[in-house]
């Protein structure tokens, strides 16, 4: 399936139906009086978070969504039917932004969330509504109100427990493939990964979701390489696994390059809990491994994990370290939910 993480969409709610001008006509009833019904409301525009989606690709092929108009009122005091609603179905993690791409209108993070974006126009009054003591046979009715319209942006930020960051060719996709059932493209050249990938990790009978994003290079926040737009997909992660290629020229400099991009991006990524790991250690001599480990430790100011996704060495330890941080975050969320839980006085 192709991946698309943002789309511009036009939405319009339905117009209200017009009220009806009608009079009661029956045998032996000379002055039946007005009986025009009201118009129906226009359809609303909803957005709903559904299961089974992880891309916005459907909105590449259809960008215009219009709800149905309300039906007009009819005689015998019959009101028009409400117009059919239109529902935009999106994956969990989708944000709805105004046309300025800054104002957040909705943030859908849980399956089943449903938010009304636009309300349909009200139906017009039929002439029965205008009957008064001084005007027993009004010949006027209201038209329905127009619906609302706007352009919106849908932006997907994948929901994962842990995220993989690093320079291109740091071994992120290999790590994802080794620890999950995901099958990312793996090759020995930069930017093999062109869009984010998700996988479910199982360790010690537990599960968590791991996200792999395309590699960052120096100047990514200014648009270099693939830029930093994909960093939005790890904004919701509790912990980052920063992989540094052990075969690169200088592990410390490689680490600092990515850290600078995280700081430049903002969004609190630089403050996320970070686990640092030196990858591809099976390709290093003992002397070079020691040198790269020391360089990385000085740059990160913490002891890095050592792993090889190919041989599996050090991988279980990295997964358990991620799981420990994720569990801590989940427990904190549960504790916070208990604090705010409503109780009768």
From Swiss-Prot:
Entry keyword annotation includes Metal-binding: yes
Cofactor: Mg(2+)
Any single GO CC term annotated in Swiss-Prot or TrEMBL for this entry: cytoplasm
Residues holding Mg(2+): 173, 193
Residue span(s) of domain Obg: 1-159
Enzyme Commission number(s): 3.6.5.-
Group of enzyme by EC: hydrolase
Domain of life: Bacteria
OBG-type G domain: residues covered: 160-327
This protein's name: GTPase Obg
Encoding gene (name): obg
């Amino acid at each position: 399936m192709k991946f698309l993480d943002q789309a511009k969409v036009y939405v319009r709610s339905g117009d209200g139906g017009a009220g009806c001008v009608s009079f009661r006509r029956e045998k032996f009833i000379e002055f039946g009086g007005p009986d025009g019904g009201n118009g129906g409301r226009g359809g609303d525009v909803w957005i709903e978070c559904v299961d089974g989606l992880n891309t916005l690709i459907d909105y590449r092929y259809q960008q215009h969504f219009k709800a149905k108009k309300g039906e007009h009122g009819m005689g015998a005091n019959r009101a028009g039917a409400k117009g059919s609603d239109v529902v935009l179905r999106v994956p969990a993690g989708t944000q709805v932004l105004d046309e300025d791409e800054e104002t957040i209108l909705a943030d859908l993070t849980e399956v089943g969330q449903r938010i009304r974006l636009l309300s349909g126009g009200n139906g017009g009054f039929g002439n029965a509504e205008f009957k008064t003591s001084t005007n027993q046979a009004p010949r006027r009715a209201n038209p329905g109100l127009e619906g609302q319209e706007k352009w919106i942006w849908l932006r997907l930020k994948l929901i994962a427990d842990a995220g993989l960051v690093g320079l291109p060719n740091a071994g992120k996709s290999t790590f994802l493939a080794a620890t999950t059932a995901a099958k990312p493209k793996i090759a020995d050249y930069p930017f093999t990964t062109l869009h984010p990938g998700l996988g479910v990790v199982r360790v010690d009978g537990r599960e968590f979701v791991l996200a792999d994003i395309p590699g960052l290079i120096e100047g990514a926040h200014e648009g270099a390489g693939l830029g930093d737009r994909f960093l939005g997909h790890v904004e919701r992660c509790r912990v980052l696994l920063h992989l540094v290629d052990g075969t690169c020229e200088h592990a410390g400099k490689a680490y600092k390059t990515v850290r600078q991009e995280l700081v430049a991006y903002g969004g609190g990524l630089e403050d996320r809990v970070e686990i640092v790991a030196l990858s591809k250690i099976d390709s290093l001599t003992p002397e070079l491994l020691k040198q790269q480990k020391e360089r990385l430790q000085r740059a990160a100011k913490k002891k890095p994990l050592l792993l090889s996704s190919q041989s599996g060495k050090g991988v279980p330890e990295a997964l358990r370290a991620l799981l420990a941080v994720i569990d801590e975050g989940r427990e904190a969320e549960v504790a916070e939910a208990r604090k705010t839980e409503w109780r009768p006085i």
